[in-house]
Curated annotation (Swiss-Prot):
A Gene Ontology molecular function term of the record: carbohydrate binding
Pfam families documented for this protein: DUF5107 (PF17128), TPR_16 (PF13432)
Gene3D superfamilies noted in UniProt: 2.70.98.10, Tetratricopeptide repeat domain
InterPro entries from the UniProt entry: DUF5107, GH-type_carb-bd, TPR-like_helical_dom_sf, TPR_rpt
Gene expressing this chain: yphG
Organism, as annotated: Escherichia coli (strain K12)
Protein's recorded name: Uncharacterized protein YphG
Length: 1093
């Protein structure tokens, strides 16, 4: 076999530019993204995109053997950008020839194609950022590219090794996720290979997958033949949803369960496919996502690629069978897992696969089709097909296959009972098999149910478990704090709830409160004896004492923690830190060894142990150990620092800097460890040698100097912040910033940390100090405004603060947007809001979301022509899940201008505008969803036809206007029917003479409004996508009231109750003058009353 080749090169790829990172912190406490919290802190977001395309150079790393060739882009999250099947001369993963980001990612920019690795949540926060990488050669001729990062949102580390072996036609992916924190964390892992969509695509799910779930298991469908309603699509006729062409709307589905280790996709057009193989006990997740085979999906295809067409996301979950589905990672725990991605050909739909082979056994009109595809050499193997329960084989052939080759055949003229196919190795061991699956008429599994609200819980056990779920899944609308606090309200000494609260308080740097909760937990744990099974409360209290410099108390609790198995490793590590701080290196080495016996993968302890060997003069032992550690952890920046520190060679310095590439997280991790080990002088030396010129490392470096010597570093830290926006999120960063009391920007960053952790009083104190020290700093005033509105509900105070901010930064489009948003949420008149935006029109037009507000304000103030100009010329970039904001204004604009022509007795011109409203212009970057009934457009088309004397066309249009769903949802999303559609349905029914049906519809609307107005509403527990980047929050209950009023208003109009209509409209307008389609109804309702009633 030819050895695997690996090389690095710069590749030029056509690339669309993004806008700059937003320098403002985003506190998104209510944002929902992919079914969990859409919070973006500590990152800066990028929410503006460009149509400018340039040929950009990217760092690429290639792997190639005789069968496949793979390109990895470390500068784009370490994704596999291209995977080429050399045998079939095809991309076995969808290849996008351009880098064309759309607003799909957690932080904004996201690109399609290749294989993305989504962790620690979906989509990967750093999917559009550089990560670390290095290369490793193996003695057998294999090559590995390691990519990874320390991710600052959750404080976890990942290493992923991409390996090609000389004798294997598969990409082997070995990953390690590590938690280097003192408290547990949570992560998800969904590898996300894209495959070619189109008419020829078919997903290859295992034969035992008979049901699939939606996100959060909130809905379920039969599979592969769907027979019910799924994603609002009627599949009752029986539709094969494994085919791309049969799924018309954006749709996710995830296998309920499977006992097989594979999932894949087949392209009928290319006679080739992709398979993923992994242990299903570790990797149960099998998912398909598509944008939908429709105008809607095609619009997203155009937003993501120039010429490569539609794609499917074939996702594979590790420790996860659904999204969101996070798994726990204990303090200092490491999880390892392997996955294989491989091309295959010839066999089509297959029934089982392993890391060595793929088998097919399928009945068709031709007979019994069988096949075998080799991933690795199959020498001396046998393939047998038998009827279960019978001895004689229908097929029993010797097999000799090289990788990437296949054999197949057909058994004719027989119709046996259940069959099995078996592949055996040279020793007769069955290595892969499949028994024909016999479908059974089983009921669909139940969908998930939302848990009780915290105040309704009566059991501490239930309170703790729900709190754990919310914490684990990063739930967007409910807080685990509420459930743990409910638990301690029921039982003040409940061990688990107090322990959970202690850990949460520790994570947000409230160490005294962490001690208090841990002490409460220990009152129960130590009530009968001092040696409980669980030592976690002692461990977290010790860590909290240590953070406060109370080392004697910390030592006592660390010793108590080592008595218990689940806290022994952490306890000995704590003792090792204290020993190192005191210069007692021999004791520190012993404690490290004790800790490693309990947890041998704790990279913190491994690094400390190696450093203590160096400091105690045992350099030879340190070097031997470090060589092994660097083979195990080739991306650990602290190990590479140790490699330089031990010898101070220029080559070692270049290696260390080459790995870190100036990324702040690497500098912060190593410096933070050294500070925690009581070695601030080494930390300062390390930061000086690495020379990372980003804000937080510069602050950390400054904090280690005397106050009189750090002015230059502090000034530089402030100056470079906009170049790479990152806010503090670790305890070491907080401690450093708190020590630099003379810096106003450090006060701001501390306020950001505490506000994000929901320690609002601390945050406000820091922002107030910030603006006292630097009253010209806009973001300090913005922070105070956010708190004033969201937490104090004080419009006047928030407005004054935001006015200060915008006056200080009049070119800042986000500040203008938020000032307008504040007016919108407080019910300001359209005229007042429009005056502000038009006075700053150039700034307002910098943002799509603010432009959408402008469009609505122009409509409300009778200036539809101004809105039409923008809608005809501006290129918009919607967020995934936030579609409809601009297209709704486009439809409204067409309706308003059509009405103007109707009112001027120009029905033909009106008809043309209405017809155009049925198709969105390409510059809006959105397509229509199938099933969109457009009742308003068809109603007015009928009015136009009637005005032109075409009663046949009028009736046809009325029939269309009268169709559609007649339900009203409490929560509304982009794919939900607007509530006013029901009104137009009822109006159409009236004009068709179906008065009784219309009367019933309007009566049901009125009843719904009356009943729901009495209902208290809460956020949708299973919401999947609410992507708006809004730091100022609306009142959910008021929004519900507005919806009820609008439904009541339209119901009254439909029933001819003019007084009730006017009353509801006045009340609605008083609380929200910009209610949906107010411009239309205010204009046309006199005509409606005259025409219909």
């Amino acid at each position: 076999m030819t050895p695997v080749k690996v090389w690095q090169e710069r590749v030029e790829i056509p690339t669309y530019e993004t806008g700059p990172q937003d320098i403002h912190p985003m506190f998104l406490e209510n944002r929902v993204y992919q079914g969990s919290s859409g919070a973006v802190y500590p990152y800066g977001v990028t929410d503006t995109l460009s149509e400018q395309k340039t040929l950009k150079s990217w760092q690429a790393v290639w792997l190639e053997n005789d069968y496949i060739k793979v390109m990895i882009l470390p500068e784009l999250g370490g994704r596999v950008h291209r995977a080429w099947d050399k045998v079939k001369q095809r991309d076995f993963v969808y290849h996008n020839e351009v880098i064309k980001p759309a607003l799909v990612g957690l932080l904004g920019p996201w690109i399609s194609g290749g294989i993305e690795f989504n962790w620690p949540q979906h989509h990967r926060p750093t999917t559009f950022m550089p990560v670390d990488f290095t290369l490793e050669a193996h003695e057998d001729g294999a090559q590995t590219v390691w990519v990874g990062e320390t991710e600052p949102m959750h404080g976890l580390q990942v290493m992923t090794g991409f390996t090609l072996r000389p004798d294997r036609a598969a990409l082997e992916i070995a990953s390690r996720v590590y938690n280097g924190n003192a408290t547990p964390r949570h992560f998800l892992w969904w590898a996300n290979p894209a495959v070619k969509g189109g008419e020829g695509h078919q997903s290859v799910f295992p034969p035992d997958v008979t049901a699939v779930f939606d996100h959060g298991k909130r809905a379920v469908s039969a599979f592969p033949i769907a027979t019910g309603t799924y994603y609002k699509v009627d599949y009752s006729a029986g539709v094969d949803i494994s085919r791309y062409k049969n799924v018309p709307v954006p749709t996710s589905y995830m296998a309920e369960k499977s006992q097989y280790d594979f999932v894949g996709a087949w392209c009928h057009d290319e006679d080739g496919g992709l398979l993923h193989v992994a242990n299903h006990h570790i990797a149960p997740g099998k998912k398909q996502w598509s944008w939908g085979h429709s105008e809607f999906g095609q619009a997203w295809d155009k937003s993501l690629t120039d010429n490569n067409g539609p794609y499917i996301e074939l996702m594979t979950g590790i420790f996860a069978d659904n999204q969101p589905d996070f798994t726990w990672l204990d303090a200092y725990e490491e999880k390892r897992f392997e996955q294989y991605f491989l091309p295959y050909h010839s066999l089509g739909m297959v029934q089982n696969a392993s890391r060595d082979a793929v088998i097919k056994l399928q009945r068709s009109k031709r007979g019994i089709e069988w096949g075998l595809y080799a991933i690795s050499p199959l020498n001396g193997y046998r393939l047998a097909i038998r009827e279960i329960g019978k001895c004689n084989a229908l097929l029993d052939d010797a097999v000799a296959l090289m990788p990437a080759t296949a054999i197949q055949g057909v058994l004719h003229g027989i119709n046996p009972e259940r069959l099995t196919i078996e592949l055996s190795d040279a020793d007769g061991n069955i290595v892969l098999s499949y028994q024909e699956h016999q479908p059974q008429a089983l009921p669909l599994p139940d969908v998930a149910k939302a848990p009780l609200a915290a105040q309704d819980i009566t059991s501490t056990d239930e309170a703790w478990f729900i709190g754990q779920h919310l914490e684990q899944y990063h739930h967007a609308s409910r807080s685990p704090f509420d459930y743990y606090l409910r638990g301690v309200a029921l039982d003040p000494l409940d061990y688990r709830c107090n322990l959970a609260l202690a850990m949460l308080e520790y994570n947000r740097a409230d160490f005294p409160q962490a001690v208090a909760y841990a002490t409460q937990a220990l009152k129960r744990a130590h009530a009968l004896n001092k040696n409980p099974q669980c030592g976690q409360a002692s461990l977290i209290r010790a860590s909290a004492y240590e953070r406060q410099g109370q080392y004697q108390q910390a030592e006592e609790d660390f010793w108590r923690a080592v008595w218990s198995g689940n806290s022994k490793a952490g306890g000995y590590y704590g003792l090792a830190r204290l020993a190192a701080r005191n210069g007692n290196f021999d004791a520190g080495l012993d404690f490290c060894q004790q800790s490693l016996r309990a947890c041998p993968t704790n990279q913190e302890v491994l690094c400390l142990h190696n450093l203590l060997l160096v400091l105690s003069g045992r350099q030879d032992n340190a070097r031997v150990q470090r060589e092994k550690l660097l083979r195990d952890y080739p991306l650990n920046a602290t190990l590479w620092w140790l490699n330089w520190f031990d010898g101070r060679s220029e080559s070692a310095l270049a290696q260390w800097r080459g790995l870190c590439q100036g990324r702040d997280v690497n500098a912060l991790m190593t410096a933070g460890q050294l500070i925690n080990w009581g070695m601030p002088t080494l930390a300062a030396e390390m930061l000086n040698a690495l020379d990372c010129q980003r804000t937080l490392p510069l602050y950390l470096q400054a904090s280690l100097l005397p106050k009189a010597e750090r002015g230059e570093l502090v000034a530089k830290a402030i100056d470079v912040f906009p170049q790479f926006v990152r806010f503090p999120n670790t305890l070491e960063e907080v401690a450093a910033l708190e020590s630099i009391e003379e810096c106003w920007f450090a006060r701001h960053l501390l306020a950001c940390f505490y506000y994000n952790k929901r320690s609002y009083n601390k945050a406000i104190a820091f922002w107030q100090r910030c603006v006292e020290m630097s009253p010209e700093f806009a973001d300090g005033w913005r922070g105070l405004a956010i708190h004033a509105w969201n937490k104090q509900h004080d419009y006047e105070l928030a407005a004054r603060y935001l006015d200060n901010a915008y006056q200080l930064a009049p070119q800042d489009a986000r500040l203008l947007f938020e000032r307008d948003l504040l007016d919108k949420l407080s019910g300001a008149t359209p005229e007042k809001r429009l005056a502000r935006l038009e006075n700053n029109l150039e700034i307002a037009l910098k943002r799509d979301d603010m432009t959408a507000e402008l469009l609505n304000l122009w409509h409300l103030t009778g200036q539809a022509d101004k809105a039409a100009d923008i809608l005809a010329t501006r290129k918009f970039h919607p967020w995934e899940g936030g579609e409809g904001k601009v297209t709704s204004q486009f439809i409204l604009n067409q309706l308003l201008r059509a009405w103007q022509h109707l009112d001027a007795r120009q029905p033909q011109q009106a008809c043309e505008l209405l017809h155009a409203a049925l198709h969105y212009p390409e510059n809006l970057s959105e397509g229509r969803l199938p099933g969109q009934t457009d009742n308003d457009i068809w109603f007015w088309q009928a009015i136009c036809a009637n005005a032109q004397g075409d009663e046949t066309e009028a009736t046809r249009c009325l029939r269309l206007a009268a169709t559609g769903d007649r339900t009203i949802n409490i929560h509304s999303y982009y794919n939900d029917q607007p509530v006013d559609y029901l009104f137009w349905q009822g109006m159409a029914l009236r004009l068709l003479g179906e008065q009784q049906t219309a009367q019933q519809l309007f009566s049901e609307m009125k009843q719904w409004a009356q009943e729901m107005a009495k209902t208290s509403i809460e956020a949708d527990f299973f919401a999947v996508s609410q992507p708006d980047l809004l730091s100022l929050y609306g009142d959910l209950q008021q929004q519900h009231k507005e919806k009820c009023l609008m439904v009541a208003m339209l119901a009254s109009a439909g029933l001819g109750e003019v007084a009730q209509y006017e009353s509801a409209r006045a009340e609605l307008t008083a609380i929200n003058p910009a209610w949906p389609k107010a411009a239309l109804f205010t204009t046309v309702m006199p005509f409606i009353f005259n025409r219909v009633h």
